[in-house]
Design a protein with these regions (language model features):
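Functional transmembrane core segments of multi-pass inner-membrane proteins
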Residues: 115-120, 124-235, 240
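Short, conserved phosphate/pyrophosphate- and ester-handling motifs at nucleotide-, phospho-/glycolipid
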Residues: 19, 196, 254
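Interfacial loop-to-transmembrane junctions
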Residues: 240-266
């Protein structure tokens, strides 16, 4: 078995763990910030949320084994193990998308330390996109955690493969793409939220690092993040057109998934 196949297999195994954890985090955020305050008329205590976030809404059965945050919805066949009530389809979708993107990233990058920050970007991008699709918001905590994990991964990859100057590509990428999105946010905050700016900054970190070239230490990262912005705009335009046709009128739509998809495509293209 080749090294690439082993890495892909390991990435898929990792996705089996990461996918349910992402669902747990998404459910926690949606319940804490959106659903429970509407039901209770107040922000719930941590204990209230902790008792409900891994249980079936119908019968109260636990959906996670002891000591683990969640059990894969795919392994449960999308149903509660006790009352067999169908679980929300997006739980399985998050796990399947995470597994597919983990496998794709591992197949493209192969057995390299640079795979670590890409997997962190994928995990964070999936979580933020799921929330954005649900309520058109990108959790600040998700963005900060993803930025921290991606940065640590890039530092580790630079320490192993070098050169240290490549980290400047990450800085340039984050500054350029984050700055561009900030300007667009200031021009039209209704169409582009500040959460999108945070996500774009994280994407810029990875895209700038992978876009760095020894002969193009500045232009390379800038070109990479501009490509990411262009792809995001194209994906967003297509999504907006589809929604316009489906809904019959112009309405705001979540732009976070387009940024996440564009960032991953540019990173893999430069890997």
């Amino acid at each position: 078995m080749s090294d690439v196949a082993l890495v892909v297999g390991a990435a898929l195994v990792g996705a089996v763990v990461v996918g349910p954890v992402l669902n747990h985090a998404i459910t926690w955020w949606l319940g804490w910030r959106v659903v429970l305050p509407l039901l209770l008329g107040r922000v719930p205590a941590a204990g209230e949320l902790g008792r409900s976030r891994t249980r079936c809404a119908q019968c109260g059965a636990g959906l996670a084994p002891a000591g683990l945050p969640a059990r894969p919805a795919v392994a449960l066949a999308g149903r509660c193990p006790r009352c067999h009530t169908r679980l929300p389809a997006w739980l399985a979708a998050v796990e399947l998308v995470t597994a597919a993107l983990f496998g794709l990233a591992a197949a493209v990058i192969g057995p390299a330390v640079a795979l670590v920050p890409v997997l962190a970007l994928v995990a964070g991008g999936v979580a933020m996109s799921a929330v954005d699709l649900a309520v058109m918001r990108i959790p600040t905590r998700f963005a900060y955690v993803t930025a921290g994990l991606v940065t640590l991964g890039l530092v580790l990859a630079t320490a192993v493969d070098g050169p240290a100057r490549r980290l400047w590509g990450a800085v340039v990428g984050a500054a350029v793409l984050g700055g561009l999105m900030l300007v667009l946010h200031l021009i039209s905050p209704r169409m582009l939220g500040f959460g999108d700016v945070r996500l774009a900054t994280v994407v810029g970190l990875a895209a700038g690092w992978f876009g760095w070239r020894s002969d193009l230490p500045v232009i390379g990262p800038v070109q990479a993040v501009l490509n990411a912005g262009l792809v995001a705009a194209l994906v967003g335009a297509v999504a907006g057109l589809v929604l316009l046709v489906a809904r019959g009128r112009d309405r705001p739509f979540p732009f976070g998934p387009a940024i996440a998809v564009a960032g991953l495509l540019v990173v893999l293209a430069n890997a």
